[in-house]
Amino acid sequence: MDSAGLHINFRLSHVLTVVTCILYILPPTTTAYSLPAPGKAAFQHQLSKRDVSDGSAERRPYTRMGSGGLKLHCQVHPANCPGGLMVTKKSDLLGALLSRNSPSSYGLPSRDMSTAYKRQDVRQQLRMFDDLVQLRKLIETPSVYPSEEDEARLYD
């Protein structure tokens, strides 16, 4: 092939590459710009009924507490409540907020208990890791036999 034929092939491949890129980039870009502006109406279909307040919560006595205006939107599902508590009366709300760290009457574990379990688990993992390090030291030095204390500690 002569240089003119190579030049034409190069130009043709360059044009096809540009057209292909435009065809892949243009539709998603135009779709993104044609969407409505994000607002309340645009996301209304993504919310469930328990996430949207219909105004009736303002009339319920257990959704406000005092002049601070503490509102709870946990009428239907306890996952919406702070700390996962389902509260049905104002006195229950006050008790739940005051005794947040104690085991509640709702059957939920307190924060202190969960952190205690986590700490215990971490301690157990550290003990296991320490035992593995000791075992590896014993394996790496075969000429030194472990004492009876080391063996007893490893198998406890």
Curated annotation (Swiss-Prot):
Keywords: Cleavage on pair of basic residues, Disulfide bond, Neuropeptide, Pyrrolidone carboxylic acid, Secreted, Signal. The modification Pyrrolidone carboxylic acid is found at Q120. The keyword Disulfide bond applies. It comes from the Eukaryota. One of its GO terms (biological process) is neuropeptide signaling pathway. The keyword Zinc does not apply. Expressed within the abdominal ganglion in neurons R15, RB(HE), the two L9(G) gill motoneurons, and L40 interneuron, all are parts of autonomic control circuit that contributes to implementing a central command to coordinate autonomic activity with escape locomotion. Disulfide bonds join C74-C81. Residues 27-48 form a propeptide. One of its GO terms (cellular component) is extracellular region. The alpha-1 peptide acts as an osmoregulatory peptide, increasing blood volume, and also modulates the activity of a set of cardiac motor neurons that control heart rate. This is Neuroactive polyprotein R15.
